Amino acid sequence: MGKVALNFNRIVSANLNLFASNTDICSLCETAIAHDLSSVLIFPTSVPLCANLLEHSNLKLDAVIAYPHGRSTLESKIAEINQVAKFGADAVTVFINYSALRSGEKNITANEIFALATATQKRQLQLTIALEGSILEPKHLKFAYNASIEVKADAFLSSYGASFSETCNQINQISSNENTPIKLQAYLRKLNPKMIQKLNSMGVDIIVSDGDLNKFK
């Protein structure tokens, strides 16, 4: 079997390391530009630096909100969305309060997703709804996914940090043969071309990874 090529413009390079330095963030952006990736995913505090570094590139700048817990208040999430928009972000990946969803409080989840979509559309930001699917029942994961489709969110991320087998299980729970306007994202710790190919065959559009891109020049 021949070598599987990576489609770099469908990869999001992330650095959500709490101890990442400005040097690490600069390296992230430089490598992403060199590989012509889809976007970079970073904490809100790094948005001004990344906005400057990515100014003349085609990459999108994506800021993560309420990672990993999702339990910030809705008001604080919207405030951060407004702030990163001013700083130069093109998109946000927002972790919803999936603990509430786990408890069966679907109204809280639906209302939050609707409010997040309204806030991002007002700011003309792309929105990825994110959660930690490994602690949710399939019916809860599907509910969040369908609610995201209903409000016209741009993408859905079922986990950040899950193992490959966990990710595949989550994708199986929500993916369908029907064409949907929302992009399905999946996390991979290492950028393994065969794993990416498998996820793509399952309906995944975008790979989110904190792996070393320089290994795939």
Please report, for each region that a protein language model flagged, where it lies by residue.
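Conserved mixed alpha/beta catalytic, RNA-binding, or beta-rich assembly cores of soluble enzyme
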Residues: 62, 76-80, 85, 91, ...
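Alpha/beta catalytic cores of nucleotide-metabolism and tRNA/nucleoside-modifying enzymes
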Residues: 2-23, 179-183, 192-217
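Hydrophobic faces of well-ordered beta-strands that scaffold small-molecule active sites
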Residues: 6-15, 38-42, 59-66, 90-94, ...
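Glycine-rich phosphate-binding active-site loops on the catalytic face of alpha/beta enzymes
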Residues: 67, 87-101, 150-165, 189-191, ...
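Active-site-adjacent beta->alpha loops and helix N-cap segments on the catalytic face
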Residues: 42-59, 72-78, 99-119, 135-141, ...
